[in-house]
Amino acid sequence: MPGGLLLGDEAPNFEANTTIGHIRFHDFLGDSWGILFSHPRDFTPVCTTELGRAAKLAPEFAKRNVKLIALSIDSVEDHFAWSKDINAYNGAAPTEKLPFPIIDDKDRDLAILLGMLDPAEKDEKGMPVTARVVFIFGPDKKLKLSILYPATTGRNFDEILRVVDSLQLTASNPVATPVDWKKGESVMVLPTLPEEEAKQLFPKGVFTKELPSGKKYLRYTPQP
């Protein structure tokens, strides 16, 4: 498909009609981190569970200075009506308000620009719908992570929150997060960091795992 973003690309400063009115994307993001996530259609089962979970986790994203914004090829009017179903699914009052806006991309302009269309999933007119895309942008407006799911597989928003924790931690410290890492657990010191410098940067200690190769690349430290 034409369009699309690669890691490190700056987010296009697009304009869009949303459930909070007309926006410019860079103005919407401000100095925050941002997550732009698309879904195939309003009033569908998997999408309802996804946005319901995103709504429940919205306070956790806000604590991390992350703004959420959703997108689909449905109209703002549909977004408002569907929001009632999402809130009801969450056991809340069936209002039109969600803790994040949803973009109206019924002409598919943004879906094409950002490479979000799923050619395997079509609407009633035979046109491709948006896939389950997740873009995470840093305060510099650059793409830090992208994930693409097919329509049949719902996303894990707890995992997306975990990824945000990793991205924010590693943006300000010379560390990486190992497999299955969770916030508060030990992290790995980057192999490029000299040993003496690592000791100075991480006063809680640097612990090296001995390996048959004799190479000292598995270095752990408590989370800074």
Swiss-Prot record:
E.C. code: 1.11.1.27, 3.1.1.4, 2.3.1.23
Residues recorded with modification Phosphotyrosine: Y89
Catalyzed reactions per annotation: a hydroperoxide + 2 glutathione = an alcohol + glutathione disulfide + H2O; a 1,2-diacyl-sn-glycero-3-phosphocholine + H2O = a 1-acyl-sn-glycero-3-phosphocholine + a fatty acid + H(+); a 1-acyl-sn-glycero-3-phosphocholine + an acyl-CoA = a 1,2-diacyl-sn-glycero-3-phosphocholine + CoA; 1-hexadecanoyl-sn-glycero-3-phosphocholine + hexadecanoyl-CoA = 1,2-dihexadecanoyl-sn-glycero-3-phosphocholine + CoA
Record's keyword annotation contains Transferase: yes
Site (Important for phospholipase activity): S32
Keyword field: Acetylation, Antioxidant, Cytoplasm, Hydrolase, Lipid degradation, Lipid metabolism, Lysosome, Multifunctional enzyme, Oxidoreductase, Peroxidase, Phosphoprotein, Redox-active center, Transferase
GO terms of biological process kind: bleb assembly; cell redox homeostasis; cellular oxidant detoxification; glycerophospholipid catabolic process; hydrogen peroxide catabolic process; positive regulation of mRNA splicing, via spliceosome; response to oxidative stress; response to reactive oxygen species
Modified residues (N6-acetyllysine): K63, K209
Domain Thioredoxin: 5-169
Cross-referenced PROSITE patterns: THIOREDOXIN_2
Region of interest: Required and sufficient for targeting to lysosomes and lamellar bodies: 31-40
Active site: C47 (cysteine sulfenic acid (-soh) intermediate), D140 (for phospholipase activity)
Residue list for modification N6-succinyllysine: K209
PTM field: Phosphorylation at Thr-177 by MAP kinases increases the phospholipase activity of the enzyme. Phosphorylated form exhibits a greater lysophosphatidylcholine acyltransferase activity compared to the non-phosphorylated form. Irreversibly inactivated by overoxidation of Cys-47 to sulfinic acid (Cys-SO(2)H) and sulfonic acid (Cys-SO(3)H) forms upon oxidative stress.
TM ranges: none
pH dependence: Optimum pH is 4 (for phospholipase activity).
Molecular function GO labels: 1-acylglycerophosphocholine O-acyltransferase activity; calcium-independent phospholipase A2 activity; glutathione peroxidase activity; identical protein binding; peroxidase activity; peroxiredoxin activity; phospholipase A2 activity; ubiquitin protein ligase binding
Residue numbers of Phosphothreonine PTMs: T44, T177
Localization (cell): Cytoplasm; Lysosome
Family statement drawn from the similarity comment of this UniProt entry: Belongs to the peroxiredoxin family. Prx6 subfamily.
Role played: Thiol-specific peroxidase that catalyzes the reduction of hydrogen peroxide and organic hydroperoxides to water and alcohols, respectively. Can reduce H(2)O(2) and short chain organic, fatty acid, and phospholipid hydroperoxides. Also has phospholipase activity, can therefore either reduce the oxidized sn-2 fatty acyl group of phospholipids (peroxidase activity) or hydrolyze the sn-2 ester bond of phospholipids (phospholipase activity). These activities are dependent on binding to phospholipids at acidic pH and to oxidized phospholipds at cytosolic pH.
Name the record gives this protein: Peroxiredoxin-6
The encoding gene: Prdx6
